Amino acid sequence: MSPFFHLAVILSLAASLACAQSSVASGELHGTVADPSGALVPAAIITVENSVTGLTRTVPTDEAGEYRVPSLPPGEYKVKIQKRGFRTQVSSDLRITVGQIAVLESKLEPGVDNEIVLVTSQAPMVESERSHQAETLQQEWIQNLPINRRDYLTYTLLAPGVVDATALADNADFRVKQTPHSGLSFYGSNGRGNSVTVDGGEMNDTTGGVRENVSQDAVEEFQINRSNYSAELGGATGGVINIVTRSGTNQFHGGLFGYFRNDALDAGNPFARVLEGNTLTRIKPSSRREQFGANLGGPIRRDRTFFFAAFEGLIRNESSVVSLLTDPSIFGPTPDQEALLRTLPAATAGPLRALLTSPQSTIDLFQRNSGVFPFATHDWKFSVRIDHQLGSKGQLFLRHSYAHLHEQNANLQALVGATRGTEVSLADPTTIAGWTQTLTPRLINDLRAQWNYHNLLTDSVEKYGPEIRIQGYGVFNHDWVLPTRWLERRYDLKDHLTWQRGTHSFKFGAQALIRGIHAENKVFFAGRFTFGDLPGSVLGIPGLPDSFTLNALQTFNLGLAQTFLYGAGNPVIAQTYPYYGFFAQDSWKLRPNLTIDVGVRYELDTHKAPLRTDTNNFAPRIAFAWNPSADKKTTVRGGYGIFYAPIYFQIDYVVQALNVINGNRQIAQVFSTILDTTAANSANVFSTLRAQNVIGVPTPARSITTADLAQFGMNFTHSGPLPPFTLIFENARDFVNPYSQQSSLSVERQFGQNWALSLEYAYVRTLKITRLRDSNLKPAPVDPALGIRVWSDPVRDFVDPLIAQRNIFESSGRAFYSGLIVELRRRLSRSLSLDANYTLSRAVDEVTDYTIDYEPTDQTNMNADRALSSFHEKHKFVAYAMWTAPGNLQFTPIFRANSGRPFNLLVGYDLNGDRHDTTDRPAGAGRNTGIGPDFWSLDLRVGRSFKLRETTALDFTAEAFNLFNHLNYASINNVVGNITGPFNLTGRADRTPSQPLGFTSAFDSRRIQLGARVRF
């Protein structure tokens, strides 16, 4: 859509409505008023005024001398208290943050009400009435901490109990590009099941990811709700992040900024090597990054109407490092094979050596795909917000935002070849509007409406297929599940009503989210060949020992593909599926030092056949906040609740497009193996198509078509009898929404004026997690030599021998998390503020994600996959600070350290004969028994501000990410063959990426960024 369209939207809506300030985008003020004797004062008049916008709210105290002011936009406030017979008291500099329940206790002095008493006491650090576990990051942190990409969601990783869901230790990361997740693992979750809101409007997509939204400069602050949040928040089994954007004020303010990087200042990458002749040469990847933007805010009409606009652009021209080829010896016999060759007669050894040695075409394939490759990112964000006050009883605001992203040659890393890169194009406009109205001093209504359009296109840079997966060595060519295009239109309407009655604060609300989607996903259309280890007996050479094995690279050279997968048909699914949510919540101040929060939420996540709608998603929640000490500097909080996540549309798509419904197949698929005795044998298909120049090595010749496959008897009709070795994807009849049971208990204590220490225990039990299982397998007998089930009989071991796989989505996965959290905070005092937290945790689950490659090793024993989660970090420590030194120098460091994550050992071929070649572990090995490398890094920003005029300043900053250039290995080659135990293995720095347990990639080495900002 053109920029003129978005400008038209802003101008046409500016005179109408805007977003409501519900508690997901606002805070509350609770207070008591007493006389000098401590007796509570009823009917006092409380006036709360925003210091920069003039927003005013007036409420009386009740019979108990208490008052509540909900739905306050984040900001600085002054509170005026008036009562006949007492002096008027004014408290200033009271900060209200998003999701906060601020408490103000006041004592009035006798006198006449035209006498004013100014109170400037500091607010307590401990939120004495907050019952759930949460953190709030204010603008001071957002603007000054060194964050690598100015992505404010990355700040969430600073919170305890949250880890990076994008960083698996397994080199074989089977999650697919078109089903992104949030990147945030709350309490051991897999990155899905979280929810993000901006100004109260949801910013999630249909797969559990987060949509592009606004510039970091447009963010006022955000709250991270880790667990036990109220019934007002829903659609998540993990965390909920509430982001609030900045508004204009009575003063014009704005700025320009730019941040710049160049590889001349950066450290090199240890995996950046290219093969020149027979020599590996280290090179330094090129890198250029410019990130720039501007913002402007101010009054349209003083004390009445305001605006704030922000723009941000990111241009990256950098390099990805692919470590496919760091050891040329992989193209010859292995050391064990060399030892055998020396014992064989020359007449046998010579031809065998030739078979074990890669041809030039294979060497060219690796050279073409390994090394350093450019990638580019262009990311643009723009937003305008308008606020309008309807006197003292109503507020309107409107925000329109637009995000555009284009990535070229992304997704390259480790053993993912250059021809497997992806191209992403995204357009995402959002308009949100609403109205907050004070109906009576004790009754407030919030109405909010949002419209979003999400257009995402993901394709492979290499337009031809098929995908070639050489287990443990590399993945090449067109991604087998691309291209894909998702068009979403989401209409979100919410209404919340807050009613104050005595010691109760009731909230009631409803939401209707209409999700319309047009999905075009050419899954399997490119085809995929998989190569793994095979016994040497396939060569037919007499005299070879039974232990002689061909590795995956050698089977590729010989054209011995273990499996082949292909699909064709109509890739389009379009439908509308609404979501409805309803809640009721009561915050009851049972005693002056005890608050009980009780609520229930009901969610109706509708779906169309063959999925069914789960109609019993009731989510009760209860929590408390208790202040055992009279000074209210100690708060004990805890709670329990049930939380539901949606079923993501990718599952709707698969069970409609890749299923057999009423005898029809929208996308017909075939699957063949090397064990097939017909012409459709996967090795025969590969060798024949390669000889016919349909498959080119090293350069793909063209895409495979159904006409090419007809010669093998492969049938792609979409009705009638199923052809042999069809793949089917279905959902279980009892397939339902995942849910979590969250419980926590914490104690927080303020020490002195500026320090606070908290101790928390959290336990989360997540059930009904989506997973895939092949239901076509019968329980097979245990092979006495291997000690595992082996499906060796192609007839008796399968429910339907003519079906290759019947993959069924089930609600059978489970996850368990327990964690102990210690957090120390110091608020700004003597130029220093600090936050440090430590998490000791254990995360256990049974599945990593819901793709076919994460199915269990033993499909008839799902419990055998219960193990430490891929997102388990036993120890995590984070500390960050802000210090202003003499000379107006500001230092803001972030130190992060965590223990290594588990990784899954894979054989690299179909060891147990179940027709799955990416799920097998070494015989006897449990899931995720390997332990990845530890991580630590120090980031630092140094800045200095120069005053140009009274209201204008120039800031210069220098940032170093991974200041000490510590080598943090990221992923491990987890294809190890059928090794014997023990299996508690770690990565090996003395091995190359193409060797088992060799490290395949590293996190960023030291990066330097220089920046400048003008503020006025």
Task: Report each predicted region and the residues it spans.
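Periplasmic N-terminal accessory/gating domains of Gram-negative outer-membrane beta-barrel systems
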Residues: 80, 86-247, 262, 266, ...
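C-terminal beta-signal and terminal closure region of outer-membrane beta-barrel proteins
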Residues: 968-1016
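Periplasm-facing N-terminal accessory domains of Gram-negative outer-membrane beta-barrel systems
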Residues: 2-138, 217
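Solvent-exposed loop/turn elements at secondary-structure boundaries
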Residues: 152, 345, 614, 619, ...
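Hydrophobic, lipid-facing positions within transmembrane beta-strands of outer-membrane proteins
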Residues: 182, 237-239, 290-294, 380-384, ...
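Extracytoplasmic gating/loop element in the C-terminal half of outer-membrane beta-barrel translocons
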Residues: 710-718, 888-951, 955, 961, ...
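Gram-negative outer-membrane beta-barrel transporters
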Residues: 591, 754, 758-890, 894-898
